[in-house]
């Protein structure tokens, strides 16, 4: 009986320790989190349209405990990204406000940067850093975010054919989440340059792994 009790107590201690370690390694997002950069995207530009892209945002958010309704910040030939994401304000994983409203988000006053553009897990993608800006040594640069949008949040001509193409037959407009570039003044978070294509092999050379922004509306 004593042996069984000690064994049960040991298991309890180990389980508690494991839970504590898990919590320490996987901190929960701030309750008001309503903005994040996707932590992954294995599909490139072929997201299954806006419905598929929204599903990616929703799935990633739910995996970290968010019950909000999430939308991808992506435009199509008939939809402007800025009309999809609600009215704000929006906060990142840490609870830091990145914009008060739509106008603020698409102005020079927004707070999206290498320090605030965090994933749903609170991690930072491989952004540029230093002076001059350079990617992490030996790692794939990830600062190009797919948006298919212009700086004002309206549709651009390049949207990976409305997010249904994942090869070199189409392109997407990209923004710099870290607000840095090799050229001075190139710092828009949602519209800097077009990709070489919509597959991973075309996205990676310019600094993308197909990541994009998600907002809770």
Where would I find each of the regions flagged by the language model?
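Secreted/extracellular ectodomain signature
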Residues: 22-217
């Amino acid at each position: 009986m004593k042996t069984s009790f000690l064994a049960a107590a040991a298991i309890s201690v180990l389980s508690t320790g494991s839970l504590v370690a898990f919590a320490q390694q996987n901190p929960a997002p701030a309750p008001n989190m309503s903005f994040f950069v996707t932590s992954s995207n294995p599909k490139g530009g072929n997201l299954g349209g806006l419905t598929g892209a929204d599903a990616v945002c929703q799935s990633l958010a739910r995996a970290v405990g968010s019950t909000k309704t999430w939308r991808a910040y992506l435009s199509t030939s008939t939809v402007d990204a800025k009309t999809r994401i609600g009215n704000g304000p929006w906060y990142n994983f840490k609870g830091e406000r990145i914009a008060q409203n739509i106008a603020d988000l698409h102005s020079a006053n927004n707070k999206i940067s290498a320090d605030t553009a965090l994933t749903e897990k609170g991690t930072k993608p491989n952004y540029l850093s230093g002076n001059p800006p350079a990617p992490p040594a030996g790692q794939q640069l990830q600062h190009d975010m797919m948006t298919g949008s212009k700086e004002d949040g309206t549709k651009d001509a390049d949207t990976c054919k409305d997010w249904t193409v994942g090869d070199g037959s189409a392109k997407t407009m990209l923004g710099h989440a870290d607000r840095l570039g090799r050229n001075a003044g190139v710092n828009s978070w949602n519209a800097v340059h077009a990709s070489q294509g919509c597959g991973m092999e075309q996205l990676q050379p310019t600094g993308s792994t197909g990541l994009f922004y998600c907002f809770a509306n």
